Amino acid sequence: MSDNEGRKNLRMPEGDEVFAVVTNMLGANRVKVRCMDGTERTARIPGRMQKRIWIREDDVVLVEPWDWQDEKADVVWRYEKQEADQLREEGHITDSV
């Protein structure tokens, strides 16, 4: 038995992407997120994710901050509960996020 038996390959941040936790649902396809870099941002859920991937408070997501407005971002990926637990175990995200 190997140590990686229960491990799943997860999507990791690329480029400017950062991990974040959804703190509040704002409506109109927008959520308030607390990012790993310590910034609170308003994130937009893109059309390709609407109605396909449901995002709730306390979900761990991957966001890409806007180049021209750092307090806003786009949601790129949502992690399921088991995936978020794995990220915490591996030290990629902390509970203080």
Curated annotation (Swiss-Prot):
InterPro entries: NA-bd_OB-fold, RNA-binding_domain_S1_IF1, TIF_eIF-1A, TIF_eIF-1A_CS
Keyword Magnesium included in the entry's annotation: no
Domain S1-like: residue ranges: 6-80
Organism domain of life: Archaea
Segments forming a coiled coil: none
GO molecular function, one term: translation initiation factor activity
One matching Pfam family: eIF-1a
Entry-linked PROSITE patterns: IF1A, S1_IF1_TYPE
Alphabetic keyword roster: Initiation factor, Protein biosynthesis
UniProt record similarity statement: Belongs to the eIF-1A family.
Task of the protein: Seems to be required for maximal rate of protein biosynthesis. Enhances ribosome dissociation into subunits and stabilizes the binding of the initiator Met-tRNA(I) to 40 S ribosomal subunits.
Official protein name in the record: Translation initiation factor 1A
